[in-house]
Amino acid sequence: MTNADTVAARTPPPKLKTPALAVLFATVFINLVGFGLVVPLLPFFAQSLKAEAWQITLMFSAYSLGQFFAEPFWGRLSDRIGRKPVLLMTLIANALGYLMLAFVPNIWLAIAVRLFTGLGAGNISTVQGYVADVTPPEQRAGRMGLIGAAFGLGFIVGPGLGGLLTQPQLGRLGYQLPIFLAAALAAVAAVGVVVFLRESRAKADPAAPRPAFLAGLKDARDNAVVSRVLVVTLIYMAGFSAMESVFGLWSESRYQWGAREVGLSFMIVGIVSTLNQGFFAGRLARRFGESRVLATGMLLFG
């Protein structure tokens, strides 16, 4: 047993009290609200920077690319140095990313800033790790469900609010208002982490072996069920992301929509998705089987 294991065994983890749970809920909620706030305005904001269509889609991809690479990194780092500092660093990075986006002078800097913001947004696994650290096994599913609810609620509120706050008639300021709000929310969540969260994990022994990211991918590849689920999820998310990146441009060309209409459309998607996951998917899967429900969902999505 290492020294870190001994310390962890002697020091019980803090109980997950209401303020701490609220901060964790807010962290996930803010990640999705911040993402959703800028989704409806990004195409039009990029057009104000004289961006071409392919550059606009690249700006969307940059955020997701950063999040993809950052998620396992932040998770492993939180195992080493603790959950609280990682949550604080990612929230500060989010706030800085949104502030920089508001003032970028050209599309290439906007793409770089979106990549940076995505790197700071990959903290969902850290939140889940904190919940697992301080929650008894019999309560863990319920607590994780709350985190999932924050995810869904954030994607409902964010696009709708972003669309309503965008005021193109004000020029650049009309696009900056939702971005400033996203930055302010991230800053408030960072303060909440400092004030209300106790560290849930003892600092790890630097000499202790740590699981490698590529080893995890190999394990997933060797498990037939997991690998198939990952492939299906990848295809689904790729399709959704492709639609998301061009929807604003397409709806503007086809229906003369602006950020408000695009935001409300994504808000409706969030509402339907949350209702489906929370109330219908489980019941339908128990009645008709998971494979049939999954296949039907994919067909409806297409």
Regions found by a protein language model. Give the residues of each.
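Conserved MFS/SLC helix-loop-helix module at the cytosolic interface between two early adjacent transmembrane helices
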Residues: 68-107
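C-terminal membrane-cytosol helix-exit motif in multi-pass small-molecule transporters
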Residues: 184-203
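Residue-level signature of mid-helix packing/kink "hotspots" within the transmembrane helices
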Residues: 36, 64-72, 122, 155-156, ...
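Cytoplasmic membrane-interface "Motif A"-like loop-to-helix N-cap segments
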Residues: 80-91, 286-298
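Juxtamembrane intracellular "pre-TM" segments in multi-pass secondary transporters
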Residues: 7-18, 198-231
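Cytoplasmic helix-loop-helix junction between adjacent transmembrane helices
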Residues: 112-152
